[in-house]
Amino acid sequence: MKITSRDLIIDYGHCVEKITSFLRYYLNKNGLKGYVMGVSGGLDSSVCLKLVAQGVGSKRVYALLLPEVATPTEDMEDALTLVKSLKVRYDIINISDIVESVRRSIPIYDVDDRVADGNIKARVRMTILYYYANHLGYAVLGTSDKSELLLGYFTKYGDGGVDLLPIGDLYKTQVRQLARYLELPSRISEKKSSPGLWKGQLAEEELGFTYEEADPFLYAIFDLGLNPNEA
């Protein structure tokens, strides 16, 4: 049985309705005032921002732009353009000094271990997001997708440290299609995925395969229950 990307096509209108209604339900059920989330200007966070603003209204959303020295300028420009267009409250906090302070505090810090160093950045961002959430009575909205979750391609207690994942049941290729459905700018919907933890980092180069290759395989195993040899 050969699974292809065509097998992952879904009704994106229905998908948007399900996600936005759940976002409203989650706030009401838990007595929360709104959502706070990190917005990087990348595909996943942009889709999540559009969905949550549409679902609960821009006044109940707080976006945090958390750049540091390795953050591409164009990503911050895309993030800023999007939050302004959606009329979402936002703050820009450059985390470079915080990250450098953590580095200096670690006796065994190794400048050449870019994975461990990159994860410091992700965890600093998580800490800031949860300060806002605690102070405002908000929930932290995560932006990881199903492909990243199944591949383990996230930072534990970093971008994995959230309260809910609205696109956590959508594969990366589906999120890209959803971005087009939501009419996000093409420079976002077609942007190459990157965790943004060091300069030049690209997800597919680091993984060694494309999401177009991985998603049908993951779908066959985890959704259809097929043996890997059958996928």
Residue ranges and their predicted role:
Residues E183, L226-N227:
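Residue-level recognition of oxygen-bearing side chains
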Residues H14, K18-F22, L170-Y181, D223:
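A non-catalytic, amphipathic alpha-helix used as a structural packing/dimerization or gating element
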Residues K84, D117-R125, A139-P216:
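Catalytic subdomain that performs nucleotidyl-dependent activation
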Residues A203, P228-E230:
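Charged, low-complexity surface segments at secondary-structure and domain boundaries
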Residues A214-L226:
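Short, amphipathic alpha-helical "recognition" segments used to contact nucleic acids or chromatin
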Residues I106, E183-S186, I221:
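Conserved NTP-handling cores and scaffolds of large molecular machines
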Residues M1-F154, A231:
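ATP-dependent adenylation/nucleotidyltransferase module used to activate substrates
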